[in-house]
UniProtKB/Swiss-Prot annotation:
Cellular compartments annotated: Nucleus
SS bond list: none
Top-level taxon in the UniProt lineage: Eukaryota
Keyword tags: Activator, Developmental protein, Nucleus, Transcription, Transcription regulation
Source organism of the structure: Caenorhabditis elegans
Stated name of the protein: Mediator of RNA polymerase II transcription subunit 20
Organism phylogeny: Eukaryota, Metazoa, Ecdysozoa, Nematoda, Chromadorea
One Gene Ontology MF term: transcription coactivator activity
Biological process (GO), any one: regulation of transcription by RNA polymerase II
Free-text function comment from the UniProt entry: Component of the Mediator complex, a coactivator involved in the regulated transcription of nearly all RNA polymerase II-dependent genes. Mediator functions as a bridge to convey information from gene-specific regulatory proteins to the basal RNA polymerase II transcription machinery. Mediator is recruited to promoters by direct interactions with regulatory proteins and serves as a scaffold for the assembly of a functional preinitiation complex with RNA polymerase II and the general transcription factors.
Subunit record text: Component of the Mediator complex.
Amino acid sequence: MGVTWVFEAEQTAKSVERLLESIGGDLHGTFIVDVTPFNPPTPSSDYPSNVVMHHSKCPQSTFSICPKDTFKKSPKAVCDRGFDLILSKLSSGLIADNAGKIEIIGNEYSLYKDWMIRVGTATQGTTVKGVVVEIEYDPSIIVIQCKDMMIEFVKSVFNKYHETLPEIFKITEKPESYTALDTMWQYLGIATKLRKKT
């Protein structure tokens, strides 16, 4: 997994896919991301919610984040796939908010061997909430090495969205390795925003 940039697109998934095909993108497969909040039985500031996420790029992993203001302040973990099964047994402490679950399902495109672009439709239950695009630059996992290249790519392909940088691009000044948790934090932010849409 390389450095990734996730954003909500204003176009339909089909129009983004046509755009990718027009610049040489090859359909590589499909992908799915799910974001499920687990909340305490009674809302309390002492006991925050926990969000459990999965990404088909990491099929054996479950990502768990207790969201705070920033990524650095948020308790987070990467667990074995069975972690969400354990949470379901802790219903006295955390209850799955299945009505708040967001699923993003779509297609993966490879472009020039270095880029993987995932375009998916986000749904909450039976309601379509939006289109999400994930751009992954595979040659490096060092954020500051990829940042400018990714900004130029987004700018040249989409002609927008390049001004809304992911938090990881803004806070990273030293050569730090990018991890899958950084990607899931971006998905969490988008899912939170999409949940509020009517």
